[in-house]
Amino acid sequence: VLGWDPAFRTGCKLAVVDPTGKVLDTVIIYPTAPQKRVEDAKKLLRDLIAKYNVYLISLGNGTASRESEQVIVELLKEIPQKVRYVIVNEAGASVYSASKLATEEFPTFDVGQRSAVSIARRLQDPLSELVKIDPKSIGVGQYQHDMNQKHLGESLEGVVEDCVNKVGVDLNTASASLLEYISGINKALAKNIVAYREEHGAFTNRKQLLKVAKLGPKAFEQCAGFMRISGGENPLDATSVHPETYQAATELLEKLGFSSQDLKRGGLAGIGRKIRDYKAMAKELGIGEITLRDLVSELEKPARDPRDEMPVSYTHLRAHETLSDV
C-alpha cells in the first residue's frame, strides 16, 4: 500500500508499506502548486508501483487532496498495473506524526513522512492507527472542551479498550499501540510481538506467540483469544475461539459432519439448528453449555465484527473518471 500525504508548498509525502505495515520506502514529490512537477512525480510513482508491486494508494483527504487525486487518476490511465486508490480520513494524523510515540517509532522520519505512513496503515487496519491518537484529537463533539478533561479522557480510553477487545486484532498488522489494549499484553510485550513479526515475517499460527520474548503461558492464555490470524495454518486462528477450546470445536464440527477447513467459506450458518440437546452435547464435549452456545455462535459467523454493518466512509473514483465526470 502506498500512503499519500497531500500538500502544496512542502510537497506530497509518500510512504510504501508491506502487508504487515512495515515501511519499505518514503519519497517526496511536487505535483501540486506552486512547483507543479507532474511528470517527475508520475515517474517516481511508476517506479514505486513497479518496484514494490503497489496495488492500492491511500490518499489523505486534507489540503491538496483533490489536486493529488487528479494526478493519480491520470497516472492510473497510463500504467499497465491494476492499481486502485482510496481517499482516507486523515483526522488526527498530524497530531500523531508530531507526537512522542511517532518519534519513538520513526526517529529518522520527519513529520510529513510519519503522516504518510499513518495514512497508508489506516487503510490496512484503521483501529491499529487510531489508537495511537488521543481520542480527543479526533473530534468527538463540539462541546468536548466544556467537559472535565480527565473524565472525558477516561471515558474515551474505556471505549477504545472495550472496542479493541470486542473485535480483536489482526496479529499480522496490529501496531504495538493497539496490542497494548489486549488483555495480558503490556507495552513491553506489545513491542516484542511487533519485533518478532518484523524479524520472522507474518504469524501463521497462534502458538508462535509463545516464541515471543517474555510472553509466557499465562500471558498467552489471556491474549490468544483476541488475536486473529487470517489465512493461517488453522482456520480457527481467525476466530475468537480460544486455543483451549480448539479440541472441543474440532470434535463438535466432526459430530455435525464438518471440519475446521469449512470455516474458510465464511462460516457455517445454521449449524446451531443441528444440535438438538445443547446440555447433552456440552457434556459430551466436556465444556459448559454457555461455552458451547458461544462456540456455535462464533462458528456460524467467524470473527463477528460490528464494523461490517457500518456504512463505508471512504470514496474513490475509477481510473477512467475525472472530476468533471462526477
PLM region descriptions:
Residues 1-4, 9-157:
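Phosphate- and other anionic-substrate recognition elements at nucleic-acid/protein interfaces
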Residues 48, 126, 155, 159-163, ...:
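Residues that form generic nucleotide/phosphate-binding pockets
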Residues 306-314:
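Edge strands and adjacent loops of beta-rich recognition modules
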Residues 166-300:
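Accessory alpha-helical DNA-binding modules that contact the DNA backbone or grooves
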Residues 125-196:
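Charge-patterned, long linear interaction tracts outside catalytic cores
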Residues 315-322:
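Conserved small/polar residues in nucleotide/adenosyl-binding loops
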